[in-house]
């Protein structure tokens, strides 16, 4: 019988919606009552894996992450479970497990440690280089991207990945200021240029006017959409029959891809007619969770 998990209202980098993921696993005795292996496709700091390993004593986890700093952080956090965790330096779109697993989880959000580290260049709250690479081994960073793209291509990128209606105006301003300066000094310098494209009243709202553009640049630098599309195609093949896949997304582009994949993939049974969202308590404790959406599917 198909279970709709949309209405479960359960419910520190703080991993989001951990209780909801644990709840979804508990709905399937086939999974939770047996010795099992899982894949944490976005290991990050190890927050989700920690709670899973703590709850299920026989569970073994394969954790994937292409960020070496995240892997080191996870290694420290999961020290007490080191015999049950295997950490692999890989993006989820490039991985192929040796054996099928009982469940897969993926949190598509940017790790808080990445955001809060100025040297990573993900945020304009603290000044840092225009980097935004999750994997430091890739060559293209945000600065290179801005310099090499044409004004039109940059505008298209900002619109496509940021849903930014002022994309053309922003792109024109970015390229104009770049030509005059020769180089942006850092994330705050770029954010200042972007903010200048907005009316004064909009520059001081709760959401900074550069937020959507920074999101678009980060997505492009890390090929996030292409990687997610590939992951959604291959992940069902990682599962045992009856196994589940849980994915947390944070913006409309990701959520739309996950929703369409879960509904349209003949291999999967969609368990969430509507996405599960964080409860009020979690949002109060972790404001970054407010835009999270969890969708779950089961392999037929």
UniProtKB/Swiss-Prot annotation:
NCBIfam families: 16S rRNA (cytosine(1402)-N(4))-methyltransferase RsmH. The keyword Lipid biosynthesis does not apply. Specifically methylates the N4 position of cytidine in position 1402 (C1402) of 16S rRNA. It holds the Pfam family Methyltransf_5. Keywords: Cytoplasm, Methyltransferase, rRNA processing, S-adenosyl-L-methionine, Transferase. S-adenosyl-L-methionine binds at residues 46-48, 65, 92, 107, 114. It is an enzyme of class 2 (transferase). It catalyses: cytidine(1402) in 16S rRNA + S-adenosyl-L-methionine = N(4)-methylcytidine(1402) in 16S rRNA + S-adenosyl-L-homocysteine + H(+). The keyword Methyltransferase applies. InterPro entries: RsmH, SAM-dep_MeTrfase_MraW_recog, SAM-dependent_MTases_sf. GO terms for biological process: rRNA base methylation. Its EC number is 2.1.1.199. GO terms for molecular function: rRNA (cytosine-N4-)-methyltransferase activity. Belongs to the methyltransferase superfamily. RsmH family. This is Ribosomal RNA small subunit methyltransferase H. One of its GO terms (cellular component) is cytoplasm. It is found in: Cytoplasm.
């Amino acid at each position: 019988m198909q279970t709709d998990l949309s209405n479960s209202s359960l419910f520190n980098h703080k991993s989001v919606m951990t209780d909801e993921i644990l709840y979804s696993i508990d709905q399937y005795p086939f999974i939770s009552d047996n010795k099992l292996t899982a894949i944490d496709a976005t290991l990050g700091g190890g927050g989700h894996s920690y709670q899973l390993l703590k709850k299920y004593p026989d569970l073994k986890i394969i954790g994937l992450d292409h960020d070496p700093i995240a892997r080191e952080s996870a290694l420290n956090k999961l020290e007490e479970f080191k015999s049950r965790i295997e950490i692999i330096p890989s993006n989820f779109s490039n991985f192929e497990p040796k054996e099928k697993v009982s469940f897969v989880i993926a949190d598509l959000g940017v790790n808080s440690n990445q955001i809060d580290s100025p040297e990573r260049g993900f945020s304009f709250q603290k000044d840092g280089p225009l980097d935004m690479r999750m994997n430091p081994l890739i060559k293209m960073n945000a600065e290179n991207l801005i310099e090499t793209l044409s004004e039109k291509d940059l505008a298209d990128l900002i619109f496509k990945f940021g849903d930014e209606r002022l994309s053309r105006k922003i792109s024109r301003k970015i390229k104009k200021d770049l030509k005059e300066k020769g180089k942006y000094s850092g994330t705050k310098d770029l954010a200042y240029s972007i903010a200048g494209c907005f009316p004064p009243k909009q520059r001081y709202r709760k959401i900074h006017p550069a937020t959507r553009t920074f999101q678009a640049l980060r997505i492009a630098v890390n090929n996030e959409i292409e990687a997610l599309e590939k992951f959604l195609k291959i992940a069902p093949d990682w599962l045992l029959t009856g196994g589940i896949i849980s994915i947390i997304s944070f913006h409309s582009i990701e959520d739309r891809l996950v929703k369409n994949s879960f509904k349209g993939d003949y291999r999967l049974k969609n368990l969430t007619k509507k996405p599960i969202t964080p409860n009020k308590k979690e949002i109060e404790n972790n404001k970054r969770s407010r835009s999270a959406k969890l969708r779950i599917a089961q392999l037929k």
